[in-house]
Amino acid sequence: VTNVDWFFISHRLPIALNAIQQGYEVYLLSRDTGRKQFLQGKGIRFIDIPFDRSGSNPLHELKCIFQLYTNYKKYRPNIIHHVTLKAALLGSVAAKLSGQHHVVNAISGLGYNFTNGRNGILQKLIRTLIRIAFKSKSFSFILQNPDDVGMIKGFNLVPSSHIFLIKGSGVDLNEFVFSQAPGKTQLKVLFPARILLDKGVMEFIDAAKLLQKRFIGKVKFILAGDCDKENLAVLGEEKLRSLLVDDYIEWIGYQAQMFPIYTDSDIVVLPSYREGLPKSL
């Protein structure tokens, strides 16, 4: 269960395919953005759940919980694997209501809302929801950074033996193979991520601006990623464009094939908040 199909393909598809090879039936409950047929062709049973990643409408969230509950009751899965915070929160509530106990909540990062100094109404609401949804002796957590482990342990939600720390989601080394640095006269520094505050986009741009007088013409800072408008931490496209500098800070948008971008870069930077080892690094 995850918010959106493209994230599943990017971060969890190999796990699902391996489970199918071992004889499991794999159902994906996610929002369909056009990848349903592709995933069904891989042997995955796709159920469309209209998750809203911005989460601004409580009635819509209740609708998603009800749809998850209905499917959990109907299919009685042996294991429910929630991926991302939103899916884990809504899915855990649905799992409790449907009597499902074998739940794994895999959260790659609690994100910008849990960085130091952020303690507003939204943060307090999310913490309250975490305490309600995740409290269960039978639930397990897979987390990717020590800060999140400390937070979940501090809530006393599950036994400590049910909390696992991993270093990242991993990459396919058959696709991303070693290559020599380009060795060009103009150094290229790459930011390979969505244009989000919790990915450190402003830190990247600010660092580039600090070096501008010394290195313009010698270095190019490149941002490769889309402005994820559904994410609360997005830096808007208009604001981003106002920060670009010709032939120095460049935005190339979403790139379906990242390997050529990596091989053409000398340095890769991702100053993100509350992540483990990001897949892009």
Language model features with spans:
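Nucleotide-activated donor-binding/catalytic signature segment of Leloir-type glycosyltransferases, i.e.
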Residues: 225, 234-253
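Donor nucleotide-sugar binding/catalytic pocket of nucleotide-sugar-dependent glycosyltransferases
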Residues: 47-48, 127-178, 188-191
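Short His-centered aromatic/hydrophobic patch
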Residues: 82-88, 107
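Membrane-proximal helix-turn-helix segments that form the acceptor-binding/catalytic region
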Residues: 15-22, 66-69, 123-142
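A short hydrophobic beta-strand element within the catalytic core of glycosyltransferases
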Residues: 268-269
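Conserved donor-binding/catalytic core segment of Leloir-type glycosyltransferases
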Residues: 180-199, 204-209, 221-222
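Aromatic "clamp/platform" in nucleotide-sugar-dependent glycosyltransferases that forms part
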Residues: 254, 273
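N-terminal strand-loop element at the rim of the active site
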Residues: 2-59, 151, 165, 227-229
